[in-house]
């Protein structure tokens, strides 16, 4: 009789979908009130002027304007939205 030993089973073979985090609006871009600026885990970037922080640390614009990234402190960043100069 022909015999074939059973093959092992692989423990790989799964891959989760990415969570689409990151910067959604970059410096100098015009934004509307409510636009999401950054999706992040924790405050990698802090909210600045006219920027709100959601429950999951999502940063969003509170007014219509232009995005500006700023350094503050020794090694921290914040994002602000300033009214566009008409």
From Swiss-Prot:
UniProt keyword annotations, A-Z: Ribonucleoprotein, Ribosomal protein
Pfam families: Ribosomal_L27
Sequence segments annotated as region (Disordered): 1-31
A GO CC term assigned to this protein in UniProt: cytosolic large ribosomal subunit
Molecular functions per Gene Ontology: structural constituent of ribosome
Gene3D superfamilies linked to this entry: 2.40.50.100
The keyword Amino-acid biosynthesis is annotated on this UniProt entry: no
The keyword Coiled coil appears for this protein: no
Domain of life: Bacteria
Biological-process GO terms, alphabetical: translation
Entries under HAMAP family matching the protein: Ribosomal_bL27
UniProt family annotation: Belongs to the bacterial ribosomal protein bL27 family.
PANTHER family: LARGE RIBOSOMAL SUBUNIT PROTEIN BL27M, RIBOSOMAL PROTEIN L27
Name the UniProt record assigns to this protein: Large ribosomal subunit protein bL27
């Amino acid at each position: 009789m022909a015999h074939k030993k059973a093959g092992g089973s692989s423990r790989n073979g799964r891959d989760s979908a990415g969570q689409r985090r990151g910067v959604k609006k970059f410096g100098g871009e015009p934004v509307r009130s409510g636009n999401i600026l950054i999706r992040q885990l924790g405050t990698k970037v802090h909210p600045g002027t006219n920027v709100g922080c959601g429950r999951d640390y999502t940063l969003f614009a509170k007014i219509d304007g232009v995005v500006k990234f700023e350094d503050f402190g020794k090694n921290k960043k914040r994002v602000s939205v300033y009214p566009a100069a008409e």
